[in-house]
Amino acid sequence: MKTINENRVETLGTNRFDKPGAIVAAIVLGFAGTGVAMGLPLLVGSIATSLHFTDLQLGWLASSDMGGLFLGSVLTSFLITRINRRYLGAFGLFLVILANYASTQSPELIPLMLSRFCAGVGAGLCYATCTASLAGTNHAARTFSIFLFVLVAMNAFIFYIFPIIDGKWGVNGLFIFYLLEAIPILFILPLMPKYYDEETDKVVTINEDSGPDTHLHVPSFLPRLCLTAVFSFYILVGAYWAYVERAGVAVGISTDFISGILTWGQVFSLSGTALAAWLAKRYGQSKPLIFALCVMVGTMLVLAVSIDRTTLAFSIFSFSFFWIFIDVFQLGVLSNIDHSGHYAALVPASQGSAQAVAPTIAGMLLSYQLGYGAVMMLCAAAAAVALIIYLFVYRQLLILVPGIADSD
């Protein structure tokens, strides 16, 4: 007889979101939702070079994109069970297209902040619809590993091509890239299921010896705590990702070297998605997540002490690998709790709100002449808070619903 920890947790019924076409449509839609966030270091650097804004103003611009991402995600979480998901994705794509075109029309700070905010809203709609649809699958770790593997490959290409585009056309070339990327995705949307039929977050434990055991309901405070942890972790992401390129330049490291490390860091992180899927089947999702956050705290502390070519390269490789690794498990935990996508749709909101405020906070630290070491200390503290929250959540799941606590 299996113990409840050894039971499998499954949803009931046939799942249209597990079909290959539905997964492909959601993943491709995710390109438009995550492109700016993943390419933020080079985009910020290009804006600085082309438009000559201060560090604080660059933080405001980065926050505009991420603030829009937050709003788009919140809107999606309210609408995802009420409105055709294809319509949500299409509206988001049209916003991305129009707002990126508008970004090419004015070099002034306020108009550019407004257009970047609108682009962020569109990206948030796309990203949240993507995550909500993938959350409807019955194999969360595997599905999100595939999703993030494809995104990392795409973003490695972005890090390769952006310096070339920037060198020829400046920051406007990058805005046009995002515009052109969104157009063909419109034709993939019909593959996505329109609605999720199951309206509850009920799951059932399947005992391998005796069949169905019991229905489990996860208390709502646990997924909300998970979203808080996502927010805290993305304070790290927003501050580090917005200023890591600037931090290297400040100590005399060439932009070509930094761009190369960023590209290879993305390639290296591909192995993290495969490892995450394997570890999830072997150890569940919470234990690898907690370990990865411990490593991330240490990485940020190393960079807080000293920034040079060696520590910068180490931090970029470590950050790139564990960022993707952590995201697989954060999304997977929420998907196990709620297949309707309501909480998963709020993940981009948590990410976007954190990335909206993090560059501004980091910019303020720099404006007070505290240096990039202070920014890295902020990153370490944010990762530590997320670590503490997930330790608590894992403990509560072991007590309340152990079948989910160590589920893959």
Give residue ranges: language-model regions:
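A late C-terminal transmembrane helix in Major Facilitator Superfamily
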Residues: 337-371, 379
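Helix-loop-helix hairpin linking two adjacent transmembrane segments in secondary transporters
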Residues: 137, 146-197
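Cytoplasmic helix-loop-helix junction between adjacent transmembrane helices
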Residues: 115-149
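Helix-to-loop junctions at the C-terminal end of transmembrane segments
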Residues: 72-85, 272-285, 366-367
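Conserved MFS/SLC helix-loop-helix module at the cytosolic interface between two early adjacent transmembrane helices
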Residues: 71-107
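Intracellular juxtamembrane helix-capping segments at the cytosolic ends
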Residues: 125-138, 324-338
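C-terminal transmembrane helical hairpin of 12-TM major facilitator-type secondary transporters
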Residues: 283-330
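Extracytoplasmic gate region of multi-pass secondary transporters
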Residues: 41, 221-263, 267
